[in-house]
């Protein structure tokens, strides 16, 4: 009787073991299979992150005496950064840039394109999507060169079209230029995501709303937006993080003129590389990572609260 009970008790354990090892590899061989991926993650993600955190606690510089004898300064770099008016100016400019070119610009423009093209014939829609996607897939360095040629004060295409020779758009309106530039570059992602989301909206619901007398705006507000709410949140989160971390505007304005386009990524680069303060730049990078985490957690909290 006792042996029967023992055998019965052991059966579930063996079943659980088989369920946990469906491939029959065993823990050692399974670990060997994932070892290359874990090694790559450790080398290119984990180690640089830990090294950056360490550098942020030191006075490491690229040149000078501190380059040969690095001191441990603890949170000194962080305190110096938080007391630096240039940091807060850069952060305010970054928030404005993200709000105008990302949250509002790319999201609204992407949704408008997706909404307006949903009834267009197949070939025309494919052509429009290809044109919009071209701005997204072309490398940022190439796009920046094209925009510099467009806005050049001497022989620029825009000045030629508007008959305004000598107009220095990059100097007179630098923030507006990088906002429009970022909208132009990133709208394709929002358009594709919203196009996919709109295709999932049941046509019967829109038809019922139309027959009930709902206007186009009412259909959008009461039927479409509640249905694609999750896609809207995902798009806004992705666009916010990408725009917050983008470095491409530097290729247009180099943060100028007079720090007027010095967003956080540019500020970190100027501090760490041309400025030679690698420890301070690492501390800024950690602060930027913390801000990204706060943004992501805030969006996740909003998403859970609306379920």
What positions do the PLM features span?
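Short, Lys/Arg-rich, polar N-terminal cytosolic tail immediately upstream
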Residues: 1-25
């Amino acid at each position: 009787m006792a042996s029967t009970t023992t055998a019965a008790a052991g059966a579930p354990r063996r079943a659980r073991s088989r369920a946990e090892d469906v491939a029959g590899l065993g823990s050692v061989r399974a670990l060997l299979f994932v070892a290359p991926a874990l090694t790559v993650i450790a080398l290119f993600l984990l180690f640089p992150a830990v090294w950056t955190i360490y550098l942020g606690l030191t006075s490491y510089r690229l040149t000078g005496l501190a380059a040969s004898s690095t001191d441990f300064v603890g949170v000194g770099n962080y305190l110096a950064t938080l007391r630096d008016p240039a940091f807060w100016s850069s952060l305010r400019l970054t928030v404005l840039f993200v709000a105008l070119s990302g949250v509002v610009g790319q999201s609204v423009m992407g949704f408008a394109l997706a909404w307006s093209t949903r009834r267009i014939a197949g070939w025309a829609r494919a052509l429009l999507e290809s044109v919009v996607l071209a701005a997204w897939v072309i490398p940022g360095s190439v796009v920046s060169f094209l925009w510099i040629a467009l806005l050049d004060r001497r022989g620029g295409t825009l000045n030629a079209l508007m008959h305004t020779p000598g107009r220095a758009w990059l100097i007179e309106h630098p923030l507006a230029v990088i906002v429009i530039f970022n909208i132009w570059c990133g709208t394709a992602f929002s358009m594709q995501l919203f196009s996919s989301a709109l295709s999932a909206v049941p046509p019967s619901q829109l038809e019922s709303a139309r027959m009930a007398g709902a206007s186009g705006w009412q259909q959008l507000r009461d039927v479409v937006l509640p249905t694609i709410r999750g896609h809207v949140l995902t798009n806004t989160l992705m666009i916010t993080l990408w725009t917050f971390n983008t470095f491409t505007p530097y290729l247009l304005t180099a943060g100028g003129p007079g720090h007027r386009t010095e967003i956080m990524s540019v500020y970190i680069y100027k501090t760490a590389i041309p400025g030679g303060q690698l420890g301070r730049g690492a501390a800024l990078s950690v602060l930027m990572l913390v801000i990204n985490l706060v943004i992501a957690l805030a969006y996740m909290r909003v998403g859970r609260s609306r379920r």
